[in-house]
């Protein structure tokens, strides 16, 4: 997990440096110090900032495993973790970002551990599905997990419930439908798509589409297709080479 983070963060950094240079930015701080600040406070750097999830997930797994080793009850972990996230939201504590998102991650990770079997009970699924739809239609509430920010007019507790019920709903739906090869492939190789898609989009946005008079919908189509095909192709090449470690995989 950390190896893909380091490798693809560096590639994102290179892409961001290229953008800064072509925009005429000559402030050395933006090249040397800003990335460090972004990493320390946000968990990732510009150019491939979606990788914050890997650092947060790494911390979540380490902390959760340590707590379970010490026989801390899962329900207690959930309560404490959610309390920290709620306090961060109430007092607008946004830095470092992982204080809140790791806490929320630990809570959701613990809930997943607690509900791993019972979530497929028909009654549990029915209640979760009903709550999910009700919140979506009556009082839409959702949280940006990276920044712990709530949507306008949303309610934090409802947003938590919405996320949990949404996970249960999606898990049940995909458990009972026929496996789709495309989705199965993406799921098995999710790391490839996750670490590469922003780089692919970043390269595409550099191209002078407006000068070429290419319509926006065509550019959007190119982005969608490239985000699916390029990571799959590069991932396949890496996986079947001595560089499979780049994606955190063992060589086949």
What are these model-predicted stretches?
Residues 1-252:
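Alpha-helical transmembrane segments and their immediate juxtamembrane cytosolic regions
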């Amino acid at each position: 997990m950390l190896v893909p983070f380091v490798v693809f963060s560096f590639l994102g950094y290179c892409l961001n440096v290229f953008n800064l240079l072509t925009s005429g930015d000559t402030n050395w701080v933006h090249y040397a110090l800003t990335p460090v600040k972004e990493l320390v406070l946000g968990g990732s750097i510009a150019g491939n900032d979606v990788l914050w999830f890997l650092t947060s997930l790494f911390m979540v797994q380490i902390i959760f495993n340590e707590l379970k080793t010490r026989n801390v009850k899962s329900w207690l972990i959930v309560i404490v973790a959610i309390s920290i996230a709620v306090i961060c939201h109430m007092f607008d504590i946004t830095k470092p970002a992982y204080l809140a998102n790791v806490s929320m991650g630990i809570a959701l990770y613990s809930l997943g551990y607690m509900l791993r079997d019972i979530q497929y009970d028909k009654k549990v699924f029915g209640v979760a599905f009903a709550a999910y739809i009700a919140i979506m239609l009556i009082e839409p509430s959702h949280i940006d997990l990276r920044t712990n920010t709530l949507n306008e007019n949303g309610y934090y507790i409802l947003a938590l419930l919405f996320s949990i019920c949404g996970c249960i709903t999606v898990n049940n739906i995909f458990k009972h439908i026929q496996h789709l090869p495309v989705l199965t492939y993406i799921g098995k190789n999710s790391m490839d798509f996750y670490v590469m898609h922003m780089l692919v989009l970043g390269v595409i946005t550099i191209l002078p589409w407006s000068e070429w008079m290419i319509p926006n919908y065509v550019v959007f189509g190119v982005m969608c297709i490239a985000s699916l095909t390029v990571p799959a192709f590069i991932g396949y090449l890496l996986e079947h080479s001595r560089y499979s470690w780049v994606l955190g995989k063992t060589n086949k």
